[in-house]
A protein has these predicted regions:
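Conserved short histidine dyad/triad with adjacent acidic residue
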Residues: 23, 36-53
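Short, conserved beta-strand element in jelly-roll/cupin
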Residues: 41-43, 52-67
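Structural motif
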Residues: 65-67, 74, 90, 100
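Ligand-binding loop in jelly-roll beta-barrel domains
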Residues: 87-111
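Short beta-strand His + acidic residue motifs that chelate non-heme Fe in jelly-roll/DSBH
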Residues: 48-50, 68-69, 85, 90-96
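A short, N-terminal "cap"/entry segment at the start of jelly-roll beta-barrel domains
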Residues: 1-34, 117-133
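Short acidic-glycine-tyrosine-enriched beta hairpin
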Residues: 72-87
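A cytosolic small-molecule/anion-sensing beta-strand core signal
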Residues: 62-63, 78-79, 97
């Protein structure tokens, strides 16, 4: 089943989900040959396991707060804060509060849908579904 992605010229609403966050799911927003955007929704205490992306990426905290574990260091993202991660850097995300994040990935040429390498076999490629621990 194909995912319903945004089309060129389509306006995308990225407002905070507010009270609807707890019932919302992570989902792909758009995907092109070189770019992928996903809205990642995590409830307080939920986490994405350690993994890395082959391309550069950004995480924008739309609402809530999350701890980003970069192995040697950690940082916190709060609403309206952005973090740039270079390609192939392992990271994990843990929600400190109910949180939604905009994940933007620059896909390297030739990688297509197989951009995500995950150390936890329960975690599927983000395009298909975002599984949390």
């Amino acid at each position: 089943m194909a995912l319903d992605h945004a089309q060129p010229g389509q306006v995308i609403d990225l407002e905070p989900l507010g009270a609807a966050l707890r019932a919302s799911l992570s989902h792909a927003i758009l995907k092109t040959r070189t770019l992928e955007l996903m809205r990642v929704v995590l409830r307080a205490g939920e986490a994405l396991p350690p993994h890395h992306i082959h391309g550069e990426m950004t995480l924008l905290c739309i609402e809530g707060a999350a701890e980003i574990d970069l192995g040697a260091s950690t940082c916190q993202l709060r609403a309206r804060q952005l973090l740039l991660l270079p390609a192939r850097v392992q990271y994990a995300v843990r929600a400190l509060q109910d949180t939604s994040l905009l994940l933007t990935i620059r896909l390297p040429a030739g990688r297509g849908a197989r951009h995500c390498v995950v150390d936890d076999p329960k975690f599927a490629t983000a395009s298909a579904s975002m599984k949390v621990a």
